[in-house]
Amino acid sequence: MAWRPTDAGFLVCCLSSNTGCFCGNVDIWRFEMAVIDRVLVGEALVIEERPDHTGLDLYNVAHIDLIIGPRGSAAEDAFCRTLTDQKQGVNGLLAIVAPNMMVKPATVMFNKVTIKNGRQAVQMFGPAQRGVAMAVMDCVADGTIPQEEAENLFICVGVFIDSHADIDERIQDWNYRATKQALKNAVAREPKVADVLKAYKDSVHPFQAKK
């Protein structure tokens, strides 16, 4: 269970031992449960039509899957493994807003499809990285992720970059939007199971083969 300090105040304290119990008023930090007290999961997809209106922009679609959790949780273990276990075609990289300025909470990105060419790699390490990083920091700035918890949280973000992606501005903007929405969903524990049960039979997936 994770805790975080709030404002200082007076509480009644009872300390027991083999010799008895002492009770009295002491000035200590009050503690309340952390907002992010366990591993949370978030997902979001952003897609629009191609600029020439020929259909959905499947080349530049952003689909984010992420986990966020506190120090000591499986999220920290996953963060360390993702960052250090590099393989050909599958790589982990820290989310940074600029060189020498990694985001807080510490965030590692990984590609969900094999990187097949240099352009795709640059898109992952450029516009996608910037979009994810800015989304994380904006979630801290707007209070979605409490600032006082940020130093002790870890985020792992799966990013989809198609090998035919051709509009870097969309990669950056859509991965920003998808990451921000996924984080908000995770922290809010959305969607609720009752909502999924109510809607899933009538739902439509943009890439489904059939209804």
Please place each PLM-identified region on the residue numbering.
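Accessory interaction regions appended to the cores of large information-processing enzymes
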Residues: 20, 25-211
